[in-house]
Curated annotation (Swiss-Prot):
Protein role: Catalyzes the two-electron reduction of the C2 and C3(1) diene system of 15,16-dihydrobiliverdin.
PANTHER family named in the record: PHYTOCHROMOBILIN:FERREDOXIN OXIDOREDUCTASE, CHLOROPLASTIC
Lineage: Bacteria, Bacillati, Cyanobacteriota, Cyanophyceae, Synechococcales
Name of the protein: Phycoerythrobilin:ferredoxin oxidoreductase
Pfam family, one: Fe_bilin_red
Family listed: Belongs to the HY2 family.
GO BP terms in the entry: phytochromobilin biosynthetic process
Organism in which the protein naturally occurs: Prochlorococcus marinus (strain MIT 9515)
Gene3D superfamilies: 3.40.1500.20
Length: 258
């Protein structure tokens, strides 16, 4: 099944313009779509009480690039109560580049919005001053419109950069406007900057590459063990499917290989 033939490419899904932009930008760099195992590529389920059941659908989309991207994947969820776009680029460890992490989650009462160049090493060892300045400038511009959410714990914050966009919005029309305009604009800026940085970077030596491999594995292992989406996914799709999805697709260290 092609994602273009699903609800996730239609305006009824909140994040459709975002996923379209992701796929089109990756195509510009000649990334190839990666076939996701059928057990995880598309799934439908129901949730809620027997008297008030809702339908929910999930689509997992993937891509690779033979030189620059080990694995890029998007998890899309659509239901009356939950709407999710979770996206991660795992860059090749031959380049000293952070992850691109996107987590846009609409819950029954709130929107949780996370966008960042997520470091796999200490920030000072992965970001030069020019990139960091660009990122912080884009972040500040975004947060002129979007409120900054509560401070993250130290355990979690180590996996984010000073350029983190992190916001919590209530569900109302003004939030819809902010998502469709300011958030989309910032998302495009981050995506374009990230891909340009990734595809113009130079290869590292073997010593630094091993540090990057270790750093990527550290992040992926943390997310496998403590993914905050686990309770929501389990309630929508069941524990067995959720554990397999998290361990085999979303945060598998098997994708960290070059």
């Amino acid at each position: 099944m092609l994602i273009q033939n699903t609800i996730f490419y239609k305006k009824e899904w909140r994040w459709s313009n975002f996923i379209k932009l992701l796929i089109s930008q990756l195509a510009k760099y000649h990334c190839l779509e990666h076939e996701i195992p059928s057990a995880f590529s598309y799934k439908e389920s129901t949730y809620g009480s027997s008297k008030s059941q809702n339908n929910v659908s999930l689509f997992t989309w993937g891509a690779t690039h033979r030189e620059r991207i080990n694995f890029a994947r998007a998890v899309c969820i659509n239901s009356p109560s939950y709407s999710v776009l979770n996206f991660l680029i795992i860059p090749s460890t031959r380049f000293n580049i952070p992850f691109l992490g996107v987590d846009f989650v609409s819950l029954p009462k709130n929107h949780l919005l996370v966008l960042d160049f997520q470091p796999s090493l200490k920030v000072e060892n992965q970001f030069n001053s020019e990139l960091l300045d660009q990122l912080v400038k884009l972040k500040k511009s975004c947060h002129k419109s979007l409120p900054i959410a509560e401070k993250m714990s130290e355990e979690v914050s180590r996996f984010f950069s000073p350029g983190l966009i992190w916001s919590r919005l209530p569900k109302h029309k003004n939030s819809d406007y902010l998502i469709e305009n300011q958030l989309y604009h910032s998302f495009k800026e981050y995506l374009v900057l990230y891909l340009n940085t990734l595809f113009t970077s130079e290869e590292v030596d073997q010593g630094l590459q091993q540090e990057i491999i270790n750093g990527q594995n550290n992040y992926l292992n943390y997310r496998r063990n403590k993914d905050p989406a686990r309770p929501m996914l389990s309630s929508l799709f069941g524990k067995d499917f959720t554990e397999s999805l998290i361990n085999k697709v979303l945060f598998s260290t098997n994708k960290v290989y070059n």
